[in-house]
Amino acid sequence: MIFVLDVGNTNTVLGVYDGDELKHHWRIETSRSKTEDEYGMMIKALLNHVGLQFSDIRGIIISSVVPPIMFALERMCLKYFHIKPLIVGPGIKTGLDIKYDNPREVGADRIVNAVAGIHLYGSPLIIVDFGTATTYCYINEHKQYMGGAIAPGIMISTEALFARAAKLPRIEIARPDDIIGKNTVSAMQAGILYGYVGQVEGIVSRMKAKSKIPPKVIATGGLAPLIASESDIIDVVDPFLTLTGLKLLYEKNTEKKG
């Protein structure tokens, strides 16, 4: 079995693959202060809960956009799994033709998503990932990673509104009854949700205009189902796109090792 870890700024998503099947997955808070032992005990509990042991795992791959956490995670893998993890970063084989000015600037999460997206859905392709930041990735019909856009995530914007406007409360991100809010909470929900729907439709439409062949639009991340339910511009919601990409990269980089 392969253990995959997608470390984001807010949450870390973990998964266990048995062949091509995602057998188990979990979402935990990303903590920069946890030690290797704390991570080890937490992951041990998650594995044990589904009847697995450290020894059931034969390979590990990690994608992270939080560099300070990597030391603890790498040491945890060595200490508890007795496995040196594969890290998504410089030197890893991706198969991507990256046309960024500096390819090293492309985040690990965006690379992993692109690998999975091309494998599952072909090209051209636009991938929207609703995380701490909302990222847009454009892959052309030649499977070249051309770049994209990065915007503040919906939660960042919501928290900023709460923090900067004294009379506005902290709210849950949810669909309001009407676009015309009748109270402060519903008005904020309408502005946040439909404001983001408008952002997605605007950016994706402009990216689509760059392609002679209509690209498929894939959304992933925690809020993807909510946003997609309010817009026809998203073709597919794939909640496990990043985990799939990690599995594919693990296979690509270990296939000669058996």
From Swiss-Prot:
InterPro entries: ATPase_NBD, Type_III_PanK. A monovalent cation. Ammonium or potassium. The active site is at D109. Its EC number is 2.7.1.33. It holds the Pfam family Pan_kinase. Keywords: ATP-binding, Coenzyme A biosynthesis, Cytoplasm, Kinase, Metal-binding, Nucleotide-binding, Potassium, Transferase. Substrate binds at Y100, G107, A108, D109, R110, T184. Its cofactor is NH4(+); K(+). One of its GO terms (biological process) is coenzyme A biosynthetic process. One of its GO terms (cellular component) is cytoplasm. ATP binds at D6, V7, G8, N9, T10, N11, T12, V13, T132. Its main location: cytoplasm. The keyword Oxidoreductase does not apply. GO terms for molecular function: ATP binding; metal ion binding; pantothenate kinase activity. The keyword Metal-binding applies. Coiled coil: none annotated. It comes from the Bacteria. Pathway: Cofactor biosynthesis; coenzyme A biosynthesis; CoA from (R)-pantothenate: step 1/5. It is an enzyme of class 2 (transferase). Catalyzes the phosphorylation of pantothenate (Pan), the first step in CoA biosynthesis. This is Type III pantothenate kinase. It comes from Geobacillus kaustophilus (strain HTA426). The gene is coaX.
